[in-house]
A protein has these predicted regions:
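Jelly-roll (double-stranded beta-helix
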Residues: 9-14, 19-161, 166-230
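N-terminal secretory signal peptides that target proteins for export/translocation
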Residues: 1-8
């Protein structure tokens, strides 16, 4: 893993709605709770003790009822042990264990002080829509070459840290790719489709911060037109 801090300080300008007018309407869809290899590319809740498929997107960490500012940064750290991460974790932090590592996600200002661990990335600013409270969720995805997500939206920003492979994000205003060690983010309510390019299995951590009164995500009727390139 690179020791260089990856800092993403742009909001992915292609997400601005003035480029496309009003987005295609979203089709409300409840969060999936059943793990099934038949539908591996919709992020599903992992029930403790349940065996999950080899490939898919799995919601593995959550922090509810957060009182966040209108713009926050995602600080991602790794720790040598669960105990070490617990000692450094704030009340709003999220700890997950994937890819043989212990990951801690914290949210705050760009210069939020660190309390230990190895800082992997700082992603943001992530713009939040007004809400009484927000919920932050961490997902872990493992996708094969040419796999793709459903077309979907979120009521808040979505951000990624790519662990391995290359992923391509298609939106109404174009495409964007990220390789291992890189990050990307999009603004709320933007229709999108995520796919894997290249010959390597892609693994990533995903953050979605959404209105606590709304679902994790919703299916969208928007249809991608631009092609992803390897």
């Amino acid at each position: 893993m690179t020791s260089r801090i990856s800092v993403l300080t742009f909001n992915v300008g292609f997400a601005l709605l003035f480029l496309i007018g009003r987005p295609a309407p979203a089709v409300a869809e409840p969060a999936g709770k059943v793990l099934s290899a038949a539908a591996p590319h919709m992020c599903v809740v992992v029930v403790p003790g349940e065996i999950r498929p080899e490939f898919g997107c799995f919601r593995i960490g959550i922090a509810k009822d957060l009182k966040l500012k209108r713009a926050v940064f995602w600080h991602l750290y790794t720790f040598p042990s669960r105990a070490a991460s617990e000692a450094a974790k704030s009340p709003s932090g999220i700890i997950v264990e994937e890819d043989g590592r212990v990951w801690l996600s914290e949210f705050g200002s760009k210069n939020r002080p660190s309390h230990g661990g190895h800082q992997v990335a700082v992603v943001g600013p992530l713009r939040l829509l007004p809400a009484e409270s927000h919920t932050a969720e961490i997902a872990y995805s493992v996708m094969q070459p040419d796999d793709r997500s459903r077309v979907h939206t979120h009521s808040g920003p979505e951000a990624w840290y790519v662990i391995s492979g290359t992923q391509c994000l298609r939106t109404p205003s174009g495409t964007r790719s990220a390789r291992a060690g890189a990050t990307m983010s999009v603004t709320p309510s933007l229709p999108m489709e995520l796919s894997v390019t290249g010959a390597e299995i892609a693994r990533s951590l995903t953050l979605v911060i959404h209105d606590s009164t709304q679902e994790f995500g919703a299916a969208s009727n928007w249809k991608p037109t631009d092609a992803c390139r390897p």
